[in-house]
Amino acid sequence: MTAVLPLALTAAACSRPPEQQFLTQFFRAARARDNTTLAMMSAVSLDPREQGTVEDFTITSVTPENRTPLDLKSLLEAERQARDAESEFAKRKMEYQNANLPVIEQVVKLERDPKARLTPAQQVVKAAWDKWREDSATYTRAVSAARAAVVDATGPAEASLTQPGQPPFDPSAFTGEMVSKDVVLDAEIRNPQGQTAPATLTVTMTRAVGTLGGEAREGRWIITRIAGV
């Protein structure tokens, strides 16, 4: 019997999902508010002061890995085009402004007075200037949206691939995909008031896989979503 026991213990240890150790370390760091460790493991926060802490958990299921191509180059190109379009528009707007500056200044001043009456010439310039200002906001929003798309796409990939001793992440030189899986947990959550209750959590783990500057790279797993807490 004594010879069988170590084998049984080994089998039990081996039956633990590989995600168990990773999540145990993450929840421990969250309880301790170890921000350095958390930053290396997760792109989302789990603040004990707001969401509580995971005191214990059991993994009930892990979904198959899902692979999504990560086309950063097209996103970077879209951002470049948006910035170029905004720059060209700003140039044309400045040309109009310089050509009509005295009247524009009059219009801007009169806009502050609700009782002011514009001359026909001022009304023409005001209509044109309103359109320039409206279009300017449209171009600004387009650049912001393009930039946000780049940040949203590169953030998890950069976090996954940024490792000691490895070259820095260059989104323009990366070709590959994001690999993700959902880990479902039965957890015991202690809320900020100190009360403990069961909860079902779904933790999404993601990593980047591909080539960076022609060199094969495989990123570490990071947490990109925690649902249920």
Language-model-detected regions and their locations in the chain:
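Exposed beta-sheet edge and beta->alpha loop/turn motif
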Residues: 80-229
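Alpha-helical linker/edge segments of TPR/alpha-solenoid repeat scaffolds
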Residues: 66-77, 83
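Generic alpha-helix signal with a bias toward terminal, lower-confidence helices
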Residues: 11, 38, 42, 69-74, ...
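N-proximal short alpha-helices
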Residues: 8-11, 112
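C-terminal or late-domain output modules
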Residues: 1-6, 13-70, 167-229
